[in-house]
Amino acid sequence: LMEDEVYDSHMVGQKDDVDDGRNMLLSEGDRMVAIVDKSEKKVKGRNFAYEVNGLKIFAMGADYIPEDNILTRQNRARTDLLLLSAQESHFNTLRVWGGGYFLDDFFYDICDERGLLIWHDFMFACASYELSNHFEENVSIEIRQNVRRLRSHASIALWCGNNELETQYENLSWPQTRKQYYDYIRLYEYLIPKLVKEEDPEKFYWPSSPSSGGNFENSNAENIGDTHYWGVWHG
């Protein structure tokens, strides 16, 4: 994808016409991204594709996982080199994997500058999360804070609830309770999409990866939504 025009906005907090010391610099772009998710007349299944400024594109890229197990060794120069390599390899998309963490601002700034799209998981992966009032409140704060921090970035194309949880519930033979299913639906198909709609209503939300749209319905279908091909690991 072509590089975005990125505009910086400097915001200063005031109270009673006096600067209160709060300053914020936001980077914004003019890219319009939609997700085409609709039935096709000529084939069995549904489209699932990026549409950028009205043009449907083929997503090419990779998962982005933490660059180093020692997080303090990560810096802007190192990330810039990695994302330059992605751009020069003709990537147009990166998926921020839900088994990692919410990244520093400079990662998103560089993606804005290099015209890379981000499929952004929330930080839930490969586990069953039991809800309590305290945990739900903690999750809500985390989602709100990070969506508010990142929503102005032109690179953010999609918010996704989790990595591989729906398909694990559907296909793995681990002990499962009715409460686990209830908590899953409440967290990824009610609470998080509700928060995203409140904080970033123009962005598309997808409940899990892979998924056919949620509710444990053939989550890794090859002709609906997105799919994970695990055969790359074990043939």
List the model feature ranges, each with a label.
Residues V96-E113, I118-G235:
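Substrate-binding/catalytic cleft of secreted carbohydrate-active enzymes
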Residues M2-A127, E136-L158:
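Active-site-adjacent substrate/metal-binding segments within catalytic domains
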